[in-house]
């Protein structure tokens, strides 16, 4: 009798357990159904509607905005947003965000907080599927793709379904607008002036971007190497004697592995990239950087520090082919690095060479 009761008790508990599991799964299912979901761009046709006559109706351009959807850093988001704005101007279209994409709309906070003047340039409106065409790009981060047939495509909404759009060629026509939109506000200008002592105002300022953080354990990207960086800083400092600002997300590592190995300690300053205000590094570059050295060649944030600096002929970057950075297999270098920038390599004996 005792065994029967025990068996009954066990079956009751087991039944309750399975019922609880089923209820939890059902709740998760309902929440997922009711919550925001990724917009399905595959429902939009891919047939290009190319006509030569002019269409007076307002036309729009949009990207799925992968970098915003997945909350990538500021450097990645700036590439995609400015590529959207630049491409829209080239095609005489209005750049928009998809108002029907609930997830996108919920993740615009980084853009809106750090560069509100940029976010304000792109309106959000719902798209009309019947009036839309989708064009698929090759899945490469740093490759300029812009077919001539875009110019004759007359659909009201053109969706360029690609990833990252990391080429300056997409936004070269709006360079002056970009610099205007990223200009430091008055309160930031006051802070920037205070960052440089009076005795250093007229001295040449070399800025070095050092990328560590998630790159250290990232199989796709190569982080900054101390061996290359120390020698590259010496190389640039010889060309442009002056102050050296080490801009990084890992100041402790920079101090121990880089700064302590430079002979001109008094001229070296370490600057930590603000976690929630990375835009300030771009402000600093605009105001003070006479040269920039990019030590992690696939870093988009380092790229923007170089792009926003005072002299585009004094931007130096490490040759990505000499690193184990996997992005080199997805990158067309002439599409990613502007032609005025200078590539630096390293010989077998450790000497820095210009390529």
Swiss-Prot record:
This is Galactoside 2-alpha-L-fucosyltransferase. The keyword Nucleotide-binding does not apply. It is an enzyme of class 2 (transferase). The gene is fut-2. Glycans are attached at residues 92, 311, 349. The keyword Transcription regulation does not apply. GO terms for cellular component: Golgi cisterna membrane. The chain crosses the membrane at residues 16-36. Its main location: Golgi. Pathway: Protein modification; protein glycosylation. Expression is restricted to the 20 intestinal cells in larvae and adult. Keywords: Glycoprotein, Glycosyltransferase, Golgi apparatus, Membrane, Signal-anchor, Transferase, Transmembrane, Transmembrane helix. It comes from the Eukaryota. Its EC number is 2.4.1.-. InterPro entries: Alpha-1-2_FucT, Glyco_trans_11. Belongs to the glycosyltransferase 11 family. Residues 1-15 are cytoplasmic. It comes from Caenorhabditis elegans. Residues 37-355 are lumenal. The lineage of its organism: Eukaryota, Metazoa, Ecdysozoa, Nematoda, Chromadorea. It is a single-pass type II membrane protein. Selectively catalyzes the addition of fucose in alpha 1-2 linkage to Gal-beta-(1->4)-Xyl-beta-R, Gal-beta-(1->6)-GlcNAc-R, Gal-beta-(1->3)-Gal-beta-(1->4)-Glc and Gal-beta-(1->3)-Gal-beta-(1->4)-Xyl-R acceptors but not Gal-beta-(1->3)-GlcNAc-beta-(1->3)-Gal-beta-(1->4)-Glc. Unlike in mammals, unable to fucosylate Gal-beta-(1->4)-Glc-beta-R. PANTHER family: GALACTOSIDE 2-ALPHA-L-FUCOSYLTRANSFERASE-RELATED, UNCHARACTERIZED GLYCOSOL TRANSFERASE-RELATED. GO terms for molecular function: galactoside 2-alpha-L-fucosyltransferase activity. It is found in: Golgi apparatus, Golgi stack membrane. GO terms for biological process: carbohydrate metabolic process; macromolecule glycosylation; protein glycosylation. Disulfide bonds: none annotated.
């Amino acid at each position: 009798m005792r065994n029967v009761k025990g068996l009954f008790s066990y079956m009751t508990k087991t039944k309750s357990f399975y019922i609880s599991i089923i209820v939890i799964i059902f709740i998760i299912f309902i929440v997922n159904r009711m919550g925001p979901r990724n917009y399905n761009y595959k429902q939009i046709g891919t047939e290009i509607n190319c006509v030569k006559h002019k269409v007076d109706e307002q036309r729009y351009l949009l990207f799925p905005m992968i970098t915003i959807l997945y909350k990538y850093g500021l450097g990645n988001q700036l590439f995609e947003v400015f590529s959207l704005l630049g491409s829209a101007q080239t095609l005489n279209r209005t750049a928009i965000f998809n108002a029907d994409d609930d997830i996108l709309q919920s993740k615009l906070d980084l853009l809106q907080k750090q560069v509100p003047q940029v976010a304000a340039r792109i309106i959000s409106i719902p798209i009309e599927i019947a009036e839309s065409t989708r064009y698929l790009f090759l899945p490469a981060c740093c490759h300029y793709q812009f077919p001539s047939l875009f110019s004759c495509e007359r659909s009201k909404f053109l969706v360029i379904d690609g990833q990252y759009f990391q080429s300056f060629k997409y936004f070269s026509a709006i360079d002056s607008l970009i610099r205007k939109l990223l200009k430091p506000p008055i309160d930031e200008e006051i802070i920037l002036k205070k960052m440089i002592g009076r005795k250093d105002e007229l001295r040449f300022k070399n800025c070095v971007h050092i990328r560590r953080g998630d790159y250290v354990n990232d199989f796709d990207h190569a982080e900054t190497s101390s061996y290359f960086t120390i020698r590259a800083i010496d190389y640039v400092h010889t060309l442009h004697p002056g102050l050296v600002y080490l801009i990084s997300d890992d100041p402790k590592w920079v101090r121990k592995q880089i700064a302590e190995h430079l002979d001109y300690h008094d001229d070296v300053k370490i600057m930590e990239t603000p976690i929630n205000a990375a835009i300030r590094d771009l402000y600093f570059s605009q105001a003070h950087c006479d040269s920039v050295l990019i030590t992690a060649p696939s870093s988009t944030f380092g790229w923007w520090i170089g792009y926003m600096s005072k002299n585009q002929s004094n931007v130096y970057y490490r040759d990505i082919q000499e690193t184990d950075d996997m992005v080199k297999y997805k990158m067309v270098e002439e599409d990613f690095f502007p032609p005025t920038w200078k590539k630096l390599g390293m010989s077998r004996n450790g000497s820095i060479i210009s390529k």
